[in-house]
Amino acid sequence: MTFNFKEETINSINADFEIILIQDKKIEKYTQSQELFKLSNYKGEGICIDMQNKILYSELKSLEYEDIRLTFANAYKALKKLEIQSVKTKSVVGKCVVNSFNAMIQGFTFGAYEFDKYKKEKTPSKLENIFISKDEINDKTYNLEEACIGINYGQVFSNACDFAKNIVNEIPQIYTPAKMAEDALSLSQNDCKISCKIYESDFLEQEKMQAFLAVNRASIHPPKLIHLSYKPQNPKMKVVFVGKGLTYDSGGLSLKPADYMLTMKSDKSGGAAAMAIIKGASELNLDIEVHSIIGATENMIGGNAYKPDDVLISREGVSIEVRNTDAEGRLVLADCLSLAQDLKPDLLIDLATLTGACVVGLGEYTSAIMGNNEDLQNDFFKVSKKSGDLATILHFNPHLKELIKSNIADVSNTSSSRYGGAITAGLFLNSFIREEYKDKWLHLDIAGPAYLEKAWGYHSFGASGAGVRMCLSYLLYLSRKQK
């Protein structure tokens, strides 16, 4: 899809169709379509297509960024069914020009996304050219340079999300740890600013990453430790992301019920997001050094599987009592977070589809932000609200820490209570964060929104790219803050 920002009036732009945005249900001035409005009982809500005049009317509920995204996503979904190649629209400017244009582009691209790789009959859209006029729907004047920046951001954010979604949607017989490593290498091959190192089992043994290795033990596919890095000249700070890359999670010997095993290809969403963030950071030419460490493995069953009652010694030297092999992601993350701290980051963020408890507590649309530093959490939350990724803060409760105590090891991998599971999982990870990084670490549990079993908002069925936009937005925020 190509986006063309035109410093021209809307009427001077040639396109197959025009999008007209309806605010406050005010449709009276569009005289050319009044007869259609009456026949279709269109009152200014939702979508109405005037084929005769080549106009699509789309409701814009407000100038909030989420409404801008939803409006253009709905418009594209309706238009892609038509035999057209181009469309034009006026600009929409809310509180911030950059964020508004970013939202417009995201709306179009999220509306266009579809994972149909395995469908025999595909219905590709011919709509490729999007023309955006300098004319603003409310006749606002605005900085055209900022508009172009917003369009660029929108394309980078959207491409990064699509990259992550394609990884998460890919099927488990194809998407093994080796395939994840291959995709990581392709990022470095296609972008000279990104470097990639892939580490095998022998490295994990050498580094004493026994928690990570235990999870992989019953899989026929060897584990991969992926380290992507983007290093600009004279970086202002260093940020390290750690992603959970479970390419499939059967639950191990604590086997998941059949219904719960469906969608477990999505347990690599955190790893996919970490890879996509590196891609986006490079395309944005950020002045921040960014690393992504991904622990890629399967969690399978077999005679060699790790077991409940096992005690594992992590890379940090912290011993872990295994009470449930389906709480495996935190074991992989524990060792990966240990390695990440050796990079001496100014900020450390992990992303993981970690707990069903997070979905129970927050619903299917919202990620959880956890950590020890309230100021850091609040900063991240404020930025996330504008990004399109829904998130909220879950505070650590010291009383819940008692629930992951073990009688035979330093910590248990599951809580002794069925309640507060999202927070106890975060507290488990906190056990592997060194004192000097406690206030520099955030844990993002993206279990709810990472994979959608039904479409909602501007998201299609399947992977959503959860975490990518809020992390890229936060990197941009940090870059501006350092200047």
Language-model regions, residue ranges each:
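Short amphipathic alpha-helical segment within the helicase RecA-like ATPase core
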Residues: 1-238, 242-245
